[in-house]
Amino acid sequence: MTVAGFGALLSERSSRMTFPALRNFRTGRLRGWRRVFAHRGGAPFRHIERVETKEMASLSCEPHAGSELVVALMDVPLEEPSWADFVVREHEYRFVAVAVDGLPRPAVLCAAWTDEDYRRVRCPDAEYHRRYGQYGIDRIWRDYLLPARLYLRHW
């Protein structure tokens, strides 16, 4: 399966930490998508957030007509054990199949979605409370957040 990475996965070194068995690391372009800092991370990210200045957003992607997104592409065998860890780590994302210029088949992209859809599809109330509610977080997908400063060191 081909993964389209846009944050830390733009680095082959970081991608290999996530998917040790990846093959064919290269760049690609997604038309109609853009990067956005639009959601709060879970409890592990509490130490990098600055709530008072709203500098607490993690990177995600969203559809946007006319935009183009450079991504890292990597082929990851479906039997790769690290898939399970990846899905757990990226729990709050919507996994979507996207068309990539020059690829005969879609790639998987971690995309933004709404709190309502996230809670309805992937994170029922008890799970949401465990991940976010106990820390006073009532919504994670927002459009007024600023990037957590830690992320900006990569740009």
Named regions from a protein language model:
Residues M1-W155:
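A glycine-rich, hydrophobic/aromatic-adjacent loop/helix-cap motif
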